[in-house]
């Protein structure tokens, strides 16, 4: 583990370009892994500047690939940069960067979805949740294939104040498909408003910082990308367990073009669905004819608070899954058909 230290200005020595690194190590983007490389260091410098002042910061980079953003982070004067890369083909190129920046770059060959970050940096960096954010940052050009499950995982970590957020309100600067970036930051009533909008915005201040055109990447993806900045809130806008909030929000957006009562009704068994849905909406003071995209975070706070009380009254309610009820119903129908034959 690195020790806390004050560093002077640092610049990497002359190195092969990212394009030359790709050629030298015969690297090719794997389409199945949604890999796309940023080669323009002016653009990677811009992304890193948007993360804020990184002088003497401790940075966790996910999915560094051939190291474009990695170089820009190192040149920002960080105290230490920890990169986690799953694809072994990129390790030699990253090792070249490590050799050029002694003591500043740590490389972990592993999976960001399972890597334990909470013990990676000095204990002295930890801050109380109500204090200013710690000098720890997460930066990453995420492969599109893992971006949504990863941000949901980290949002759950925010709610539990563990993982990267064991240090405090760790800030994140992450690249997504533009459509995902727009969903994360969508306002009430927007056509992009979604489950991701609510889950991100009830826990964090979320800003769509930058759009990166597809032609900036090699190979060129079919869609543009968006850079999103997250700062965890000192107080979540919904004070209920993450899994409960997630369940309510997921069900609300089951039928995004229909009235909200349609999806919210799926929280309850069919035998009492109409009655329980009416009770939920009445006690939460939510208009049943609103579309899911028209629901505010405050609406979801009320819905989650009432649903929590209903779960407390009925210990079996939270475990209810309408898909399982449909499956059991379908199985019974199949059994009846078999008996008739």
Swiss-Prot record:
Residues binding S-adenosyl-L-methionine, per UniProt: 38, 63, 85-86, 111-112, 141
Catalytic activity, reaction form: adenosine(N)/adenosine(N+1) in rRNA + 4 S-adenosyl-L-methionine = N(6)-dimethyladenosine(N)/N(6)-dimethyladenosine(N+1) in rRNA + 4 S-adenosyl-L-homocysteine + 4 H(+)
Transit peptide, start-end: 1-27
Name of one Pfam family that matches: RrnaAD
EC number in record: 2.1.1.-
Subcellular location, principal: mitochondrion
Stored InterPro entries: KsgA/Erm, rRNA_Ade_diMease-like_C, rRNA_Ade_Mease_Trfase_CS, rRNA_Ade_methylase_Trfase_N, rRNA_adenine_dimethylase, SAM-dependent_MTases_sf
GO biological process: rRNA methylation; transcription initiation at mitochondrial promoter
Top-level EC class as recorded in UniProt: transferase
Keyword list, A-Z: DNA-binding, Methyltransferase, Mitochondrion, RNA-binding, rRNA processing, S-adenosyl-L-methionine, Transcription, Transcription regulation, Transferase, Transit peptide
SMART domains attached to this UniProt entry: rADc
Keyword Cytoplasm among UniProt keywords: no
Acyltransferase found in the keyword field: no
Family statement drawn from the similarity comment of this UniProt entry: Belongs to the class I-like SAM-binding methyltransferase superfamily. rRNA adenine N(6)-methyltransferase family. KsgA subfamily.
Subunit and interaction comment: Interacts with mitochondrial RNA polymerase POLRMT. Interacts with TFAM. Bound to the maturing mtSSU until the late stages of assembly.
Biological role stated in the UniProt entry: Mitochondrial methyltransferase which uses S-adenosyl methionine to dimethylate two highly conserved adjacent adenosine residues (A1583 and A1584) within the loop of helix 45 at the 3-prime end of 12S rRNA, thereby regulating the assembly or stability of the small subunit of the mitochondrial ribosome. Also required for basal transcription of mitochondrial DNA, probably via its interaction with POLRMT and TFAM. Stimulates transcription independently of the methyltransferase activity.
Name of this chain's protein: Mitochondrial dimethyladenosine transferase 1
Organism: Bos taurus (Bovine)
